[in-house]
Amino acid sequence: EQVTQRGVNNLSNLINLGFDTLVISSEPQSWKKILRAGFLNFTNWAKASEQAIVASTPSIAIKYNIPLILHGENPGLQLGDMKTMGRNGYDGNNLRYMNTVAGGNLEWLLDEGISEENLISFRYPSIQEFEDSNIQIVYLGWFWKDWSIINNGMYSATNGLQVRTDIVNNTGDLTNVFSLDEDWVSLNQMIKYYKFGFGRASD
């Protein structure tokens, strides 16, 4: 219900380009309760979805014995989320401490009556699980000299990425390449601006 046709087309484009792709989603009724809980508890409907996105890669890596995870941007260096900083600029193993992931704490969802069974995709693996599986997250942006939202967006657009066409006054997205799979992000960034005084345009 939430994904845009643009998002569907971009996922199809990745598959057509030859990327192995896993699509993970939550049970729809629980998902609606989870969105509501995020909004009422944190004024951030996207909190849980960010938990699921960030948790999915190490969970899959552990399941399939993949020791190396490549992430794009370092949120500490690029977005100011300093709790994610690791031993050096490319170490991403502290991603669990990202503001919206908060160490993987799901108590707030359990308190809302969401069952553990319906929170499997939101559960971030423990430090012990990381160590037992020898997992290492590496930020590509540290090594990629011209890494930027604009450069990555331009490169991707030349390879089939569909970008936003709406004006920045409506979206707050100066580049038209942020969070393209859905349009609720504009509302979330507006609320973020009202809460903290900055949003997508000034991150």
PLM regions and their residue ranges:
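Nucleotide-activated chemistry modules centered on ATP-dependent adenylation/adenylyltransferase
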Residues: Q2-D203
